[in-house]
Amino acid sequence: DALPIFYKDIKDVNLATKVFDLSVNMGSNWAHRLVQRALRATGQDILEDGILGPITLAAINKADLTDLLAALKSEAAGYYRTLAATKPKRAKFLKGWLKRAYA
């Protein structure tokens, strides 16, 4: 029960924990955008607006969670790779970020 109330509407605790972890690290807007991108990657027609509202939550809860979690990890890794490429001073953190993305 350590997850904020905001993420308790995600039925799968592993996915909720992952989204929460990403939101702590990169901010909730980016974490929510990556979830929405992952939903799109798994075939769901969802708007990428960074809002974890009822439409996104419903899409999350009806998704194949194994596929969605894999897609979310991939999206997070892509985010971190882009961040390291565009901000070279942060590239030293890439290895740790990728471990976090795929955890």
Give the predicted meaning of each segment.
Residues 66-103:
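Low-complexity, Gly/Ser/Thr/Pro-rich intrinsically disordered linker/tail segments
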